[in-house]
Amino acid sequence: MAACIAAGYCAAMGLGRSFQAARTLLPKPASIACRVHAGPVRQQSTGPSEPGAFQPPPKPVILDKRRPVELERRFLSPEFIPPRGRTDPLKFQMERKDMLERRKVLHIPEFYVGSILRVTTADPYASGKISQFLGICIQRSGRGLGATFILRNVIEGQGVEICFELYNPRVQEIQVVKLEKRLDDSLLYLRDALPEYSTFDVNMKPEVQEPNQKVPVNELKVKMKPKPWSKRWERPNFNIKGIRFDLCLTEEQMKEAQKWSQPWLEFDMMREYDTSKIEAAIWKEIEASKRS
């Protein structure tokens, strides 16, 4: 009898151990899992956020410190700088005041010789009382309120140039279609170049450019028509870099043109016009005008 009871007790103990081992392999019940995680976790509310509600942390912003910091590029329009040799600054100071007031009404963007512009002006003889012209800027001249710029385009095989006054009240909009520079400060030689270098679609769409991006320089060199030209562009006094002289002139003609060179002017320090102090004073006037 005792042996039977002992055998039954051993069998029950073995069955209990096997059941406990199998139980550890099974996943825990939901009640146990909830009992374990119920303490530290807060229930998320579906309604409006409360002051003590949980908010996810913001996404980290990764900055590349190896990349150099881009400084803000400032552009001072050339007509603000008075010509050299003028001793009475009052006239130019009064003109700059009027120019800054005009710029509050009309946005005059940054552009250079070689940029493609679209200008809208008031025209009493046009059907819509306005007219538009698109072309490449071939020259900027004048100082103060008398600043001008020339746009050129070839329309139906005919070269058309219009000289606009920058601060003319009839100018309603100046749009930069393509901002770029050229190798030269004046592109008047396009009058003697092939028409393809002055032909632009009047329906061109403006190109988007980042504000702090450097202005690209177009290193295009044009091909000229056969002589005669309007001026002797090959002579050193023009200092032209954007013409393929090797395609239109012989070596003898180039040597003849070099006779007009004046290499000593490069070392003449009196010809340099230092405008750093003038530009600093003009920038102060511009900042004061923006605050007013």
From Swiss-Prot:
MF term (GO), any: structural constituent of ribosome
Quaternary data: Component of the mitochondrial ribosome large subunit (39S) which comprises a 16S rRNA and about 50 distinct proteins.
Disordered, as annotated region: 40-61
PTM-bearing positions, type Phosphoserine: 77
Protein name (Swiss-Prot/TrEMBL): Large ribosomal subunit protein bL19m
Alphabetized PANTHER family for the sequence: LARGE RIBOSOMAL SUBUNIT PROTEIN BL19M, RIBOSOMAL PROTEIN L19
Protein family: Belongs to the bacterial ribosomal protein bL19 family.
Subcellular location: Mitochondrion
GO cellular component term, pick one: mitochondrial large ribosomal subunit
Primary residence: mitochondrion
Superkingdom of the organism of origin: Eukaryota
Keywords: Mitochondrion, Phosphoprotein, Ribonucleoprotein, Ribosomal protein, Transit peptide
InterPro entries named among the record's database cross-references: Ribosomal_bL19, Ribosomal_bL19_sf, Translation_prot_SH3-like_sf
Gene3D superfamilies given in the database record: 2.30.30.790
GO biological process: translation
